[in-house]
Amino acid sequence: MRNEEKPLVSISNLNVKNLSSKFGLGPEPHVKGVLEVMYKYKSAQKLEENGTQYQWYISDSKDGSYTKLQGIHGKTIILLNDYVGKYLKCEVTAQDTQGNKAKTITSAPTSAVLYTIGNPLTDWFYEARYGLSHHLLKEFIERDFTPKQDQWDANKQTWSQFIDQFDVPKYAKQVNETGAKFVLLTLNQNSGYYITPIAAYDKYMRKAGLLGNEPNPMTSKRDLPLEIINELAKYGIKVMLYHPSNPPHSAHWKDKDFRVTSEVFHYTPGQNGAPGDTARQLVNEFMAELGERYGEKLAGFWFDGFYKEPAAVYNNMDNAYNIADFASAAKKGNPYRIIAYNTGWDKQFHKSTPYSDFSSGEDPNLKAIPSEGRFADDDCQKMLWGVLGSMDNPVHGWGCPGTSKETNFVVNCAKTVTSRGSVLIMDTRVSVFGVLDPLQFAQLLEVKKSLYSK
């Protein structure tokens, strides 16, 4: 072939790699594992790869006819029970930043996907028995129930300066004293203010014309989750992160104008509507960025708001950024990361999506009692999540000071729930200074005694 006929873009050494070799999920592909298509990319013009297209196919036999897996169009694929006994391969069309495409190439088929008993990804979660959660959120900090000294005064401090006050070593020491083996920490809910820097957020803020070269005022310069992850790791305590399934619906640039919600996220101002393509894309990009940054240090994600309207668009596999894409983004950087999607208070112990590793468990009253056994629907670890704080407020006690339950009730709940194979998360207020609510801390010490004393 003459030089002028050489393709501008090409790929070689195409193969499918099993990213999940631990916990009995390899070397053959197993349910709960993650596969990734690998190849060597080459551009004659030295341009970066951008916009490469992927499509996975499935067959009942290795040499049989393959059909397209609807909506499975990412570089990775999470293996589901539906794939057991079947063979997979991936079609790749590489592309550069100018839209030049390589010849489409298809990988060799994998070996048959094998069944996995239960869910070994959640073994650590089950063995932990109980953990804490915190609602460190701007919209909660502004509530009347937050002590005045803990509130943010935007006229005196930037959001970043406010978050800088968190004393991570002091906080980690207290958490360890409670006996909790993991923490679930909020990243953001509806305000659009994050406790960590996010490059993708900056990019889309600038694209919307709301931000120049200055730092994003709605994120902290400090990577608070990473600091907490590293400090808690010294005590053997893991960290998971909370984020809604949708973008923030009440993110204002100023004077409650909803401009960040509408112009950056293209989302429904003031309500949890169905997120459109752009809204889902941004959530995917945010989670993938954070997941890749934290890698195996980040143990899990709990996604809120997977209610009727958002679930409908995510579960439509004809859509871009569907539930398969969302789950793959959440496992970016760690194929063993566990995830859950919350469908509401009335369904604490069920598998809300095919990709759920543990149940959403939400019940602020801590009165939902699981049936015996670890798993819902064979492989979804059961979990109950409720509050310790005062419930005399519009937020049902989440992130609130004081107590709403007698200590004996809390202790008995912990013993009952964990004895049945479920995991328990207790929402505990933490101040911006990294201090746990003293009344709740006292209750947690009693929980520790009941669960771990011989």
Report the location of each language-model feature.
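Ser/Thr/Pro/Gly-rich low-complexity disordered regions
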Residues: 1-115
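Mature catalytic domains of secreted/periplasmic carbohydrate-active enzymes
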Residues: 115-454
